[in-house]
UniProtKB/Swiss-Prot annotation:
Cystines in this chain: none
UniProt name for this protein: Glucans biosynthesis glucosyltransferase H
Task performed by this protein: Involved in the biosynthesis of osmoregulated periplasmic glucans (OPGs).
HAMAP family: MdoH_OpgH
CDD domains: Glucan_BSP_MdoH (cd04191)
Keywords attached to this entry: Cell inner membrane, Cell membrane, Glycosyltransferase, Membrane, Transferase, Transmembrane, Transmembrane helix
Documented EC number(s): 2.4.1.-
Positions on the Cytoplasmic side per record topology: 1-138, 217-511, 591-602, 703-847
Highest taxon in the source lineage: Bacteria
Gene coding for it: mdoH
Bilayer topology: Multi-pass membrane protein
Pathway: Glycan metabolism; osmoregulated periplasmic glucan (OPG) biosynthesis
Family classification: Belongs to the glycosyltransferase 2 family. OpgH subfamily.
Upper lineage: Bacteria, Pseudomonadati, Pseudomonadota, Gammaproteobacteria, Enterobacterales
Any Gene Ontology biological process: glucan biosynthetic process
Length: 847
């Protein structure tokens, strides 16, 4: 069998069609497949003529509506995106310095901002009621939180051992040794630091407590006159004048999972009868060449299987500016003015058609709403860690989400996905300028969602949470270490966002959102400092010999004070603040029915196990978050890798590498406290033993075998597992199907496999007009690639080749036409295995 015969056998043709092809050489095969009989001056350009035929034989159902067009040079191109109609979207520079703004105002250089509210007086009056109610509620929250904090801090002050200055005689400190004076003052300095940290941390816990409490009352009553979901009946027909784009920005994700969830979502939309009102955009920032080819193949399969031609689009950016927010902005500039709304989906998002239609109805019923955020439910994972987190978010999450809505109303959060956005104001007001200056907190904004919500509200548009709208789902990281990788990115992003706290025009609620975003991570080093100071105070108390007689001829000693009854009361009240939200959550489930959670006893046991699990993990997260905060301030680089989204267990080696320092700290801490005062070790036990056990908990909780065992026992059961909605059932079904036909080593297959090469050539985006300089560059890229082994061809050079239709055609021709010359490539490809289910093509044979 010669090389031409081998090439013909690799084509997805019927036996009769293969027999009709010439066996003389590769070029003749491409000429025979070219229905237009084009001629090329270069022999290795001949594969460009057969692109259409190779595609039609491999994916006949994907090209039913004439997606193949001609580019400016007459080459076949697969039209994966509609024609762009550009809009202007540009950011205003940030003015983060209020002193500078005041100085400009004095000099008459104050510029009228673009974000001045566009609402009419009538529209402002219609919204004034809920805005007034929201303001009053937030003042009440502030008063409750501060009052609770003041009382608790006073209690804390009274139980500390060194009261007043009775143990120090200031006159004796004059002229005495500095070290002696320092040791006398040290307990008071430590106590002052402890009190300050306690006040900050207690205030943070108190705010969460009141949020959960109001959420509980809201859900228990079941009626919310200010819920945005109450503005529609739920069955109104969608306005045909408003189109909605479902956009999914992805970057090096699990291709099988992305397209499984997207297919399930689209089929659910079609089942509602509203598919004509939606289009889908897959916006890829992937830079792994193998994944890029797999995405192209998966897109072709998707549009064939759901008849999505002309409604499901795919684009891969060659210039990845500003990460996810830049990807969304790029969509808005090119195609945004064709749509009234867009729904942003994450790579693991799944949404039902009813939920998506409901979001559109809410937008149409509330013309002053700029963003409406759904409340996604976590599901779909099988590791013990993920199932425990799914249970926690499913049980506790509704309370906190409803509580957030109660306090914020239309000035709420946006979490970056599973939300609908009004496109026009987003284009006009939500472009993100880089933060000025230098260092780790300057440059492109990392956590864009909170900032975009703040900018939307600054322009007068409402930002709502539809907390009671069902049908929105997401997945959680499968293990602790993968969650912490995500937390590191979020930590850096939230610290950057705090630079916008004093930006002109921001609503006080969103200034508070920036503050709470920082406290989500800054509370960890504050808690660690609180524990460290408490330990230091205990060390001083244990090792320093107290002086009971400070005056000459003093008759009665001055004792350090200890108030155990107040200590117990403060400890009990703190535990109430921490754990009452969990109790309220389970009480709500008891009231409304426990069947979907495994029954009364199982859901109660699951809650107790989750509490134990959270106690074990809290100190571990504390230390990691402390490191994240410190590293952000020191300017250590943050790597933006996509999070792990499958059920992947943590190896023992990685666990001890990541948690080894925590284990050592826990051992030293425990031994030291046991030597000083065994009673104090009792209070520190939940902290130090959690650190000692951290590598073991991390590994065991990451295993899906343990998680599936709890699933069989109906522990950590959630309604989405008890009675899965159809959209999640379909996602699992399509995920299994996609994994059976997964394409690995996509770049090498795009070079050698005739069908995948035709796809890569047709979808290549670097379609420049012919020029001598360009030809020289193309020849250099191809020659350099083929003169090296494939293993030495780095990622960036592969992407350059993959982006150019001419280089892909020439690579394909040369490796097939001269296999002996490029033996390193041929041998490497022959060592790979093409999944037989990866390409189906035409199955009919000649009669």
């Amino acid at each position: 069998m010669n090389k031409t015969t081998e090439y013909i056998d690799a084509l997805l043709l019927s036996e009769r069609e293969k027999a009709a092809l010439p066996k003389t050489d590769i070029r003749a095969v491409h000429q025979a497949l070219d229905a237009e009989h084009r001629t090329y001056s270069r022999e290795d350009d001949s594969p460009q003529g057969s692109v259409k035929a190779r595609l039609e034989h491999a994916w006949p159902d994907s090209l039913a509506k004439g997606q193949l067009i001609k580019d400016d040079e007459g080459r076949d191109q697969l039209q994966a995106m509609p024609k762009a109609t550009r809009s202007s979207m540009f950011p205003d520079p940030w003015r983060t310095n209020p002193v500078g703004r005041f100085w400009d105002r004095l000099r008459g250089r104050d510029v009228t901002p673009r974000y001045v509210s566009r609402l009419t007086k009538e529209e402002q009056a219609s919204e004034q009621k809920w805005r007034t109610v929201g303001t009053i509620r937030r003042y009440i929250l502030l008063i409750l939180t501060l009052a609770q904090t003041v009382v608790a801090t006073w209690y804390m002050k009274t139980i500390l051992p060194y009261q007043g200055w009775a143990l120090i005689n200031p006159m004796d400190m004059v002229g005495q040794d500095i070290w002696v004076s320092f040791m006398q003052l040290l307990p008071y300095m430590l106590q002052t630091g402890i009190l300050i940290l306690f006040a900050v941390l207690f205030c943070w816990v108190s705010a969460g407590f009141w949020t959960a409490l109001m959420g509980f009352l809201q859900l228990l009553i079941g009626r919310d006159k200010y819920s945005i979901s109450a503005s529609t009946v739920g069955d109104e027909p969608l306005n045909p004048e408003h189109q909605t784009a479902l956009i999914m920005p992805i970057c090096n994700e699990d291709v099988s999972r992305v397209f499984a969830g997207l297919r399930a979502t689209w089929e659910s939309v079609k089942a509602t009868g509203n598919a004509a009102h939606f289009d889908v955009y897959i916006l890829s920032d992937s830079y792994n060449p193998d994944i890029c080819v797999a995405e192209q193949k998966a897109w072709m399969e998707l549009i064939a299987e759901v008849q999505g031609e002309g409604q499901i689009f795919y684009r891969r950016r060659r210039r990845r500016m500003k990460r996810k927010s830049g990807n969304i902005d790029d969509f808005c500039r090119r195609w945004g003015n064709q749509y009234s709304y867009m729904v942003v989906l994450d790579a693991d998002s799944v949404m039902s058609g009813e939920c998506l239609s409901g979001l559109v109805r809410l937008m149409e019923a509330n013309p002053n709403a700029g963003i409406i955020q759904s409340s996604p439910k976590a599901s779909g994972m099988d590791t013990l860690y993920a199932r425990c987190q799914q249970f926690a978010t499913r049980v506790y999450g509704p309370l906190f989400t409803a509580g957030l809505h109660f306090w914020q109303l239309g000035e709420s959060h946006y979490w970056g996905h599973n939300a609908i956005i009004r496109v026009k104001p987003f284009i006009e007001h939500c472009a993100l300028a880089p933060l000025p200056g230098e260092g780790s907190f300057a440059g492109s904004i990392l956590s864009h969602d909170f900032v975009e919500a703040a900018l939307m509200r600054r322009a007068g548009w409402g930002v709502w949470i539809a907390y009671d709208l069902p049908g929105s789902y997401e997945e959680l990281p499968p293990n602790l270490l993968d969650e912490l990788k995500r937390d590191r990115r979020w930590c850096h992003g939230n610290l950057m966002n705090f630079r916008l706290f004093l930006v002109k025009g921001m609503h006080p609620v969103h200034r508070a959102v920036f503050l709470t975003g920082v406290m989500s991570y800054l509370s960890a080093p504050l808690w660690f400092m609180f524990l460290a100071l408490s330990t230091a105070l205990q060390v001083v108390h244990a090792l320093t010999e107290p002086q009971y007689f400070l005056q000459p001829r003093q008759l009665f000693p001055v004792w350090p004070q200890w108030r155990p009854e107040l200590a117990i009361a403060l400890f009990a009240s703190t535990m109430v603040l921490l754990f009452l939200p969990k109790l309220l959550s389970i009480m709500l489930i008891w009231c409304k029915g426990t069947k979907e959670y495994g029954g009364f006893w199982r859901v109660t046991l699951s809650l107790l196990l989750e509490v134990l699990f959270s106690v074990l993990l809290a100190p571990v997260r504390m230390l990691f978050h402390t490191v994240f905060v410190v590293s952000a301030f020191l300017g250590w680089e943050v790597v933006w890798n996509s999070p792990q989204r499958d059920d992947d267990s943590t190896p023992w080696g990685e666990a001890f590498m990541r948690h080894g320092s925590q284990l050592l700290l826990g051992l030293v801490w425990a031994v030291g406290m046991a030597w000083l005062d065994l009673r104090f070790l009792f209070w520190l036990a939940p902290i130090v033993f959690s650190l000692i056990l951290s590598p073991f908990v991390s590994v065991i909780s990451s295993r899906s075998t343990v998680g599936l065992r709890t699933k069989r026992w109906k522990l950590f059961l959630i309604p989405e597992e008890y009675s899965p909605p159809q959209v999640l059932v379909d996602t699992d079904k399509y995920l299994e199907m996609n994994r059976r036909r997964i394409l690995d080593d996509g770049f090498m297959h795009a070079v050698f496999n005739p069908s995948l090469n035709a796809l890569a050539t047709a979808m290549a985006t670097a379609r420049h007009r012919a020029s001598k300089v360009l030809e020289i560059a193309r020849d250099r890229h191809v020659e350099q690639a083929l003169n090296e082994t494939p293993e030495k061809l780095n990622r960036d050079r592969r992407l350059v080749l993959l982006s150019d239709p001419v280089t892909m055609a020439r690579l394909h021709y040369r490796v097939w036409n001269a296999p002996e010359r490029y033996s390193s490539w041929v041998n490497h490809y022959q060592s790979l295995v093409l999944n037989p289910q990866a390409l189906q093509g035409r199955t009919s044979s000649a009669g």
